[in-house]
Amino acid sequence: MKIGNRYISATTIAIPLYIISFVGFLMEKNIKDFWKIKILNKPIKVKYNVIKLVLLAMISIVLIGMLPSKASVMILTLNYLILISAKMILIQKNNIKTVLKLWGIALILGISFVICILVFTPYQVERIDAIFNPEKYAQDEGWLALNRKMIINSAQAFGEAEDMGNANVLLDEGDNYALVSVLAHYGWVISSAIVIAIILFSCKLILDAVKIKDEYGKLLIIGISTMFILESILNILMNFNLGIEADFSIPFISYGEMNMIVNLAILGFLLSIYKRKDIYMYECERENIASDCW
């Protein structure tokens, strides 16, 4: 997507907007209407709200997947699951068993989906193998992973790595490799400091979510924080050849003017929620149903 003379990834804007919208739907009043369906000749009642949430989540995930961006699909799907889990626990703490069932179903579906992809697109198996055995695919899929491995194995405490490989080319490949480029040029101490800063930032976001008293604000903090944390973790794993190769970037670390502006705007949004952490917008009745306030 182009804004003026600057280009920005559509997913950079779409994902936070989808998350904010999804939280809004989670906060809707409980509708008592049920849809009756039969599974194996057994009648089952499903709440209208649940069906609507599932459909909206699926539509947004499919739209993101059409870009295509498997990294964004993964982050958005995990984000939705975490938000639904948080909502269920906030409604009633003894919903933990239901949450575990939800994650169990999601895990089974996820594994089935991955197996189908590997069966129908065998080249994906080579791409995964190339991450952990880059020497076998040095001329194609394993080229980036091999250069990262060379940098990691020869990196110094300070200064440039002994075997720079194609560090400059890696940096030019995109903002996803900013961390390994820092390791190549400045050493383990600086790159470790960045990782520690990311961990502390993630812990701060989690603590902020706990401190928010209002349910709507809490879910917004959880959703946006989860997005930042997942992006950071998956990017770090990818940079150190411990995770899949995808379009993961580290917020505030990966370069890109427009992406940085969007991330700063989202951070400002989080801070505006946090400064109202002790305020209730409306009086809420906290019974066995969700709060309808912000």
Predicted regions and their residues:
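Hydrophobic, glycine- and aromatic-enriched re-entrant/interface helices and adjoining loop segments
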Residues: I96-S192, Y216, L220
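Transmembrane signal-anchor hairpin modules in multi-pass inner-membrane enzymes, especially those
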Residues: E28-L55, N94-T98, D278-W294
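A juxtamembrane structural motif centered on a specific transmembrane helix
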Residues: I37, N235-W294
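Hydrophobic alpha-helical segments of polytopic membrane proteins
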Residues: N49-M66, K70-V119
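Hydrophobic alpha-helical transmembrane segments
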Residues: H185-C203, N263
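Structural signal for the C-terminal ends of transmembrane alpha-helices
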Residues: F22-K32, L81-N94, L200-I212, L270-D278
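Membrane-interface segments at transmembrane-helix junctions in multi-pass inner-membrane proteins
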Residues: M1-L26, I37-V50, G65-S72, K136-A138, ...
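Loop-to-helix entry and N-terminal half of a specific, functionally important transmembrane alpha helix
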Residues: D208-I253
